[in-house]
Regions:
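Conserved catalytic-core segment of NTP-binding enzymes
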Residues: 106-124, 129-200
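Short boundary/hinge segments that flank catalytic cores
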Residues: 1-35, 62, 66, 160-200
Length: 200
């Protein structure tokens, strides 16, 4: 996973269009896995902390729970609880492992109630979702998470994400009447100008 410096102008632009614009709950999703959702969330959470915001990151990506990966070595004691990872500057609700908890988060009203409770203690909440095309029985559908958030950002990997997956993902979000704040083009797979000039 790539770590973005929080002083990148791109991070500042995304922050100003989300938390800086008054959004308190923001879901980050993508058309397919590996497009950079988690890296962006970590950078935005750290940026929000610099503005003295009390930040919660909720990992609902049960397909590939990157943020919770280190926690997997510890036994599961039932209900998932919020933790404060050292040196992160934000609190984290790890991805649920208990099937009953996963099924509850698939219910819009349950997730909405949880968000209302969390907002009593936190200034802003970022949601790390599964990719829109990740179909798995234990996934929490990302379009449900996006629906209950005030805004959503869609990440697309340039040169790697097929157009049909992007269209299908946007259609899923439209069907749920999701407030799509915008899209971010991740150009990590695009060749640099120098390499293109050398190739020519």
């Amino acid at each position: 996973m790539c770590e973005f410096p929080i002083n990148y102008v791109e991070i500042e632009h995304v922050y100003s269009q989300t938390i800086g614009a008054g959004y308190r709950t923001v879901a980050i999703t993508s058309a397919k896995q590996g497009e950079g959702k988690t890296s962006l969330i970590k950078a935005l959470a750290k940026r929000a902390r610099l503005s003295d915001k009390n930040v919660l990151v909720v990992e609902l990506n049960t397909f590939n729970p990157t943020l919770s990966a280190k926690l997997r070595e510890f036994p599961d004691h039932g209900k998932t609880e919020i933790i404060s990872p050292k040196q992160q500057g934000y609190n984290l609700l790890p991805a649920p492992r208990n099937i009953q908890e996963i099924m509850r988060y698939k219910e819009t009203h349950v997730l909405s109630e949880a968000i209302n409770d969390w907002l009593e203690s936190y200034d802003c909440i970022f949601f790390d979702t599964s990719a829109l095309q990740s179909l798995n029985q234990s996934n929490i559908p990302p379009e449900i998470v996006c629906e209950v958030c005030e805004g959503t950002i869609l990440i697309i990997e340039a040169g790697n994400t097929p157009a049909n997956l992007i269209e299908e993902g946007i259609d899923k979000l439209k069907t749920r009447k999701v407030n799509l704040i915008g899209s971010i083009i991740n150009d990590k797979s695009n060749p640099s100008l120098l390499s293109e000039l050398i190739r020519e």
